[in-house]
UniProtKB/Swiss-Prot annotation:
Chief place of localization: cytoplasm
Record text on subunit structure and interactions: Homodimer.
Keyword Heme set for record: no
Localization per Swiss-Prot or TrEMBL: Cytoplasm
Glutaredoxin domain boundaries: 5-107
Residues annotated as binding glutathione: K22, R59, F71, C84, D85
Record-linked PANTHER family: GLUTAREDOXIN FAMILY MEMBER, MONOTHIOL GLUTAREDOXIN-S14, CHLOROPLASTIC
GO cellular component: cytosol; iron-sulfur cluster assembly complex
GO biological process: cell redox homeostasis; intracellular iron ion homeostasis; iron-sulfur cluster assembly
Binding site for [2Fe-2S] cluster: C30
Keywords recorded for this protein, A-Z: 2Fe-2S, Cytoplasm, Iron, Iron-sulfur, Metal-binding, Redox-active center
Molecular function in Gene Ontology: 2 iron, 2 sulfur cluster binding; disulfide oxidoreductase activity; metal ion binding; protein homodimerization activity
Protein name (database record): Glutaredoxin 4
Length: 115
């Protein structure tokens, strides 16, 4: 059985755009998670999420692993981008859209063609 930290590392490694949040994109359980989802969704690319309310082990361990105390947490290409305030700020400056599009394009080109 893998440890919680190993599970977190695997989630981050396997999902180029990953949001740790309270609730789900369709039903966020806090305003900060809802704002982060709106900004991410507006970038027009798919992203993965982990509902920390359903994963108390991750909720307990991720702040220590990330050295970031709060949720949501956006991880892009293996790196912590930040929480709600940073995500919104980057979106307002146009930086989030660029980062998300570039990351999505990078990983799309690595996928084998479905045809």
């Amino acid at each position: 059985m893998s440890t919680t930290i190993e599970k977190i590392q695997r989630q981050i490694a396997e999902n180029p755009i990953l949001l740790y949040m309270k609730g789900s994109p369709k039903l966020p359980s806090c305003g900060f998670s809802a704002q982060a989802v709106q900004a991410l969704a507006a970038c027009g690319e798919r992203f993965a999420y982990v509902d920390i309310l359903q994963n108390p082990d991750i909720r307990a361990e991720l702040p220590k692993y990330a050295n970031w105390p709060t949720f949501p947490q956006l991880w892009v290409d293996g790196e912590l981008v930040g929480g709600c305030d940073i995500v919104i700020e980057m979106y307002q400056r146009g930086e989030l859209q660029q980062l998300i599009k570039e990351t999505a394009a990078k990983y799309k080109s690595e996928e084998p063609d479905a045809e």
